[in-house]
Every structure is written in C-alpha cells, then in structure tokens.
C-alpha cells in the first residue's frame, strides 16, 4: 500500500474480491531495532506466510478471507516515529507530518518512503481497518522471562504502550584541564544524575513500569572538553496507563529539579 505495508490474501471459493470484510489476518513487522533479536518481527511474518502456504497446499476451504500483513516501520528505530504502517491501516494518523521525522543524517521519513517507491502523500488510501474481523500475531518475547521459566510460549495479556521523551541539559563547554571542578557547569554530570533518578523512579513504580535512557549525544564531544550540552532520549512503558502517566510526570519533574 501507500505506506509500504505488504499484504497477501487468500479468498474463499466464489468470493467477490471487491467485498473486503470479515478478514482474518496475521503477520508482523519487517523492521527491527539494534540487537532486538534476529527473529524480531520475522518470526510472525514468516509464520503467517507458512500458514497461508499450508492452507493453500492442503486445499482448506475458507469461510473468510485470510490475510498476511508485513507492517512497515513498526519500531521507529531510524526516524523515531514508530507504528507507521499499522497507524495508517487503522486510520489513526501520525502525531506530526512524516516530513518532520528525521534520522541522524537529516533524511526525513517522507523522503525515505518516496525513495523506496511508497506514496506518503496518499496514506489516506491505505486506511481499511473496518475490513478486519480478527488479528493474531506470533512474536518473540524480546525478554528473558519465558526462558528463565523454561516455557516455550506465552499468551500476551497486555502491551506496554511506549512514550518517548527527548530533552537536553545545558551547561558550559570549557577546557578540561584549565577549569577547576568547583567552577564547572558540566552538562554530562547533570545527565548522569538524571539517569540515576530515572532508574530509581522506574524501580519504585513496579515490575511492569520500565524506563530506558537509550541515547545520549554530547556536545561538543571532545575528550578534553567539558560537555556544554547533552541531548537524551527516554523510552517509558507500562501496561497501566495511569501508572505510566505518573511515571512520566515524575521523570519530567526530576529533570527540572536537576
């Protein structure tokens, strides 16, 4: 579709292909995060295709259309957008225009999609959430709980909705050798203290609440220069939205205090 989602579909006998409703779907995403697991997304994608192949080879008579979806840009690892393909299908839209989501080289997601042959200007044509009756996804755990408990598979009871924060600590860049410790305004020291506070807040709010300071960018970034600014990102998640909101509030307040 216009967003780059890939779909394959099997129809029941004598089904009018123009009438899409009651679709049973499966699938997953085809992007991943760094060190996210080599089967992240791929497991559900390949499993869906395998199911479709088995249905066809065994001449299973379908009562409803069966669809395999490979979602694009689920993780948001490059542009910090995330869930782009599924949001388009569901008609939810993005918080900002795709032209405002950029990677580390300044390339926008809109430009990258166009380079791939997608059509970000026609995303509204890819909205068709109403046609689905059911959706199921096979996915790796991306954790160690099942492994530690020697369990092969588990059933998801909730998804930890992510909330991302981007912020900066401003200090004063100076020479590392000529500036006494008591006269420094070191942005990295502030960032380090903040990371420790984020860890404390997350640990106090319980096992389901997690917060991760995933990236730091130090400016100007010299071995012999006191950092003048540190940019950071935080990934905050919980299955309980009220508790997540509480954690977000406390984490933001901690930054102000520091």
Question: What name fits each language-model region?
Answer:
Residues 32-46, 78-82:
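FAD-binding core of FAD-dependent oxidoreductases
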Residues 246-256:
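Short amphipathic alpha-helices in soluble, non-transmembrane regions
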Residues 37-40, 179-182, 246:
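Short, solvent-exposed loop/turn segments at secondary-structure boundaries
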Residues 1-37, 55:
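Acidic/His- and Gly-rich active-site-bordering loop/insert found
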Residues 18, 52-67, 97-102, 200-208:
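Phosphate-handling active-site elements
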Residues 3, 25, 61-72, 210-215:
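Beta-strand segments within the central parallel beta-sheet cores of soluble alpha/beta enzyme folds
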Residues 42-50, 189-193:
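Short amphipathic alpha-helical face segments that pack within enzyme cores
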Residues 31, 73-74, 78-241, 256:
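Midchain, well-structured core segments that form catalytic/ion-binding scaffolds
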């Amino acid at each position: 579709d216009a967003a780059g989602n890939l779909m394959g579909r099997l129809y029941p006998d004598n089904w009018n292909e123009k009438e899409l409703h009651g679709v049973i779907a499966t699938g997953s995403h085809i992007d991943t995060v760094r060190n996210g697991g080599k089967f992240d997304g791929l497991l559900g994608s390949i499993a869906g295709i395998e199911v479709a192949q088995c249905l066809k080879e065994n001449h299973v008579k379908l009562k409803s259309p069966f669809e395999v979806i490979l979602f694009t840009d689920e993780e948001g690892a490059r542009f910090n957008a995330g869930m782009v393909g599924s949001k388009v299908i569901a008609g939810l839209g993005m918080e900002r225009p795709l032209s405002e989501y950029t990677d580390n080289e300044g390339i926008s997601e809109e430009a990258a999609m166009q380079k791939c042959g997608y059509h970000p200007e026609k995303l509204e044509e890819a909205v068709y959430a109403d046609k689905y009756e059911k959706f199921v996804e096979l996915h790796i755990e991306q954790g160690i709980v099942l492994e530690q408990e020697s369990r092969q598979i588990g059933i998801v009871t909730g998804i930890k909705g992510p909330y991302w924060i981007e912020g900066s600590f401003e200090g004063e860049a100076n020479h590392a050798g000529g500036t006494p410790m008591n006269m420094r305004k070191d942005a990295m020291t502030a960032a380090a203290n903040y990371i420790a506070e984020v860890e404390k807040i997350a640990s106090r709010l319980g096992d389901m609440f997690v917060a991760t300071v995933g990236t730091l960018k130090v400016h100007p970034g010299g071995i012999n220069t006191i950092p003048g600014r540190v940019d950071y990102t935080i990934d905050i998640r919980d299955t309980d939205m009220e508790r997540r909101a509480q954690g977000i509030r406390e984490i933001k307040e901690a930054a102000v205090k520091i």
